[in-house]
């Protein structure tokens, strides 16, 4: 996995089907996630190849791949 890996950002909504917010490079999706208000971040996750990554894992990936704000 690298910064150019294709990923999608999804919004989790109670009582509704999760909706895809955006798709593109992992680096761009992490930056979009980080631009969200801190209180909203728990509602979002990133999908890569059928695997979902929550807020904590997204931050770990950002550190591992040296993705800055």
For each predicted feature, which ranges?
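Short aromatic-glycine-(Arg/Gly/Cys) micro-motifs in beta-strand/loop hairpins
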Residues: 1-17
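Generic structural motif
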Residues: 12-14, 26, 51
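A short, exposed loop/beta-hairpin motif centered on an aromatic-Gly-Thr core
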Residues: 17-24
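Compositionally biased, intrinsically disordered low-complexity segments
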Residues: 20, 33, 49-51
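A short, charged, amphipathic alpha-helix used as a generic interaction element across diverse proteins
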Residues: 24-39
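Short, mixed-charge low-complexity intrinsically disordered segments
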Residues: 39-69
């Amino acid at each position: 996995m690298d910064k150019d890996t294709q990923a999608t950002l999804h919004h989790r909504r109670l009582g509704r089907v999760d909706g895809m917010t955006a798709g593109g490079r992992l680096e761009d999706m992490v930056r979009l996630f980080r631009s969200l208000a801190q209180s909203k971040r728990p509602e979002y996750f990133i999908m890569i190849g059928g695997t979902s990554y929550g807020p904590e894992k997204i931050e770990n990936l950002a550190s591992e791949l040296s993705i800055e704000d």
